[in-house]
Amino acid sequence: MLVLIQRASQAAVHVDDEVVGQIGPGLLALVGMEPGDTEAQLQRMAERLLGYRVFADEAGKMNRSLRDTGGGLLLVSQFTLAADTRSGMRPSFTSAAPPAEAEQGFNRFVEICRENHAPGVETGRFGAHMVVSLVNDGPVTFLLRP
């Protein structure tokens, strides 16, 4: 499992010209599922995502988490994150979870995040062609692994 987080002033996901998820200040998280991702990994990643300190405190240091700020969380499935890009000129997706496994894992991850982040969690639409827009704040971007 990989999660690419970006601190955002705002972010939205459109499918077929319809907004399916949007947030104000918070985090956009692109989520790539890998074969065999476990419940423990999903739980750990949710804890890291909600507790990772990427927001400024009063002194301007990145010392506050999404949990601290009460910001929005927009989760978007993105199987291309799990691509193997080490050789050649074309990515291989054999390291990404098969679609049914990835959807089940992603949905469980969303559920865990919703249980632990009262301000709310928005999502894209699994498997759909999505148009994702964000106003990147910083930019601040991190790749998390459980």
Curated annotation (Swiss-Prot):
It comes from Stenotrophomonas maltophilia (strain R551-3). Keywords: Cytoplasm, Hydrolase, RNA-binding, tRNA-binding. This is D-aminoacyl-tRNA deacylase. One of its GO terms (cellular component) is cytoplasm. One of its GO terms (molecular function) is tRNA binding. Belongs to the DTD family. It is found in: Cytoplasm. It catalyses: glycyl-tRNA(Ala) + H2O = tRNA(Ala) + glycine + H(+); a D-aminoacyl-tRNA + H2O = a tRNA + a D-alpha-amino acid + H(+). Its EC number is 3.1.1.96. The keyword Oxidoreductase does not apply. PANTHER family: D-AMINOACYL-TRNA DEACYLASE 1, D-TYROSYL-TRNA TYR DEACYLASE. The keyword tRNA-binding applies. Homodimer.
